[in-house]
Amino acid sequence: MESVFTARESFVRACVRSFVSSLPDILISRLRGDEEDSMKLFCSGDDAPATTPKPKDGTRGEKGDRSGKQDVDRFGYYQMIMFSIISLPLFLSAGFTLAYVFTAGEVKYRCLVPECENANDTSFDVPWAAESAPDISEMSKCARYEVINHTDQCTDQVFSNVTRKCDSWIYDPSENTILSEWGLTCDVNRWKLTLVGTINNVGQFVGLIFAGYVSDRYGRRTILTLATFLSGISGLIHSFSVNYWMFLAFEFIDATVGAGIYSAGFILGMEMAGVKGRVLASTITSCLFAVGEVLLGLIAMWTRSWRLILRLVYGPALLAILMPFLIPESVRWLLANGKHDKVERIYRKMARMNGLSINDEAIGEFKEVNMVKTEKTEQLEKKNPLMQILGSSVMMTRLLACSFCWLTNTFVYYGLSLNSVAFAGDKYTNFILVAIVEIPAYFLTWFMTDWLGRKITLSSSFLLSGVFCLAIQFVPSGSWSFIPLILYMGGKWCITMSFSTVYIYTAELFPTNVRHSLLGICSMTGRMGSILSPQTPLLAQIMPALPLILFGCMSLSAGLLSLIFPETLGTKLPDTVGEAENIGKPQLKQDAQDSPS
């Protein structure tokens, strides 16, 4: 009895020592929700008390086999390293998507008064500038007062009340955009600035058509590497544009070749993470995009030059040429395409880098679960997967509903962002702050999707965003002026949560062999919302409250429509159309416990 007690005491001490040294693993595991797995790591078989029964045949036993399989699948240091590498294109994709906000942005300018100054020898802030124009509105940039009683040096008294159109302009030298580069001033040229954003979104729309096909046909790593590297080349050429039309052409090319970067990185991270780490992977990728927005804002604030912005944003993308040597292909994509030997090598490397042992029995069980297909599954896979989708009313209904949710997300998200310019402040600071606000929203999404489920998180965030947007119309004016701002930011917070949720939800609702293609279709539909959202400020000229009413009604509709989706919390990613149709059923949840993800 005493020897048993001593053995148990030694075991406890060994566990305590290992607990201290393995504290980072515990924290990571708690975030994943698999504390039992991490406890098994540092309370290994070598520390077990002598009285612990062992299988007589020298094998690990049934429980050991299951644990070995879970070890291979756990979100450990291997996954952390892979996410660190994937973070580069995810950072850059934010800059690729939103750089036009600064490259084609407004700058301060005023009319040149040739009677008082020389274009080559003057300054933007001259003492008489305020008196040379009718007022401080937009008209002051495009019209000026005529000069009377001209002397060698102008004063406030030399201007008459007669106005004339400006022939040339003086720009604020503190920043340089295509507006000041090519004189895109006044209302007659305003369409050229807004066209840049439209062309960017059209390019992404076109690019998503090809990105989804390349990803599902040739692999996630292939499209991620190719799109990032080609974007780097195109973006650098873009920065040397000699006129507006060359700039516009490469804006389209940049957006087209880079359209699949974020979705490919997102899916690669999702398929790498497994069931327990899936929401964590979604949160990380969303936060990486938000951090990329912050970095873009800091670069723009520091350089204030559209050419330097493009070079600093697109230049690092050339490093993507190294990506095939640093990250593996998606395991789920390899399995779906019958490349089982490569999968085994990846899992062995994963176990080695995570400091785990893996035996042939665990690999054997892995092969049995993932490589042995029934005749029914093989017959299904011989069919065109897209034709299977078209032939399934469940999948088509799901696809249409997802597409509307994406359309609403992008329309409301970008619409609220664009209409927020009514709030005063430095544009660089405002851009950075809006990006930072998204990060806590993503982490709240992580908590809610893991604890409450995907369906309730998506539906409630849509509904609350709609309520916030509509509630602004009922706030009395005057002393209640701060309430609309709070409600407005609440709407932006909730639509950010729905944006994060719909990405992971869409990836979980569709089978592996068409996942990126269908995600691309949804994203393409959503891109229509981002194309239309720049026009929403024009609706305010008809009725000031019309944009927010439209945002609110669409959000409420999407929130109700999303209730038709099945809950995917705790289920494995479906590999076939049949599995996708049966998502959420008890047997699928059991499969998630018995097979790697």
Question: What spans do the regions from the language model cover?
Answer:
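Flexible cytoplasmic loops linking transmembrane helices in multi-pass membrane transporters
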Residues: 56-80, 134-192, 353-418, 422-423, ...
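Conserved glycine-rich helix-kink/hinge and helix-boundary motifs of the Major Facilitator Superfamily
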Residues: 87, 194, 225, 279, ...
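Glycine-rich segments within core transmembrane alpha-helices of 12-TM secondary carriers
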Residues: 93, 258, 262, 273-324, ...
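C-terminal transmembrane bundle
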Residues: 94, 98, 251, 255, ...
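Central mid-sequence intracellular linker of multi-pass
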Residues: 105-160, 280, 303-375, 552-590
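Residue-level signature of mid-helix packing/kink "hotspots" within the transmembrane helices
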Residues: 201-209, 290, 294, 438-443, ...
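Conserved MFS/SLC helix-loop-helix module at the cytosolic interface between two early adjacent transmembrane helices
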Residues: 208-228
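Helix-breaking motifs and short loop linkers at transmembrane-helix boundaries and internal kinks
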Residues: 219, 240-245, 303, 475-476
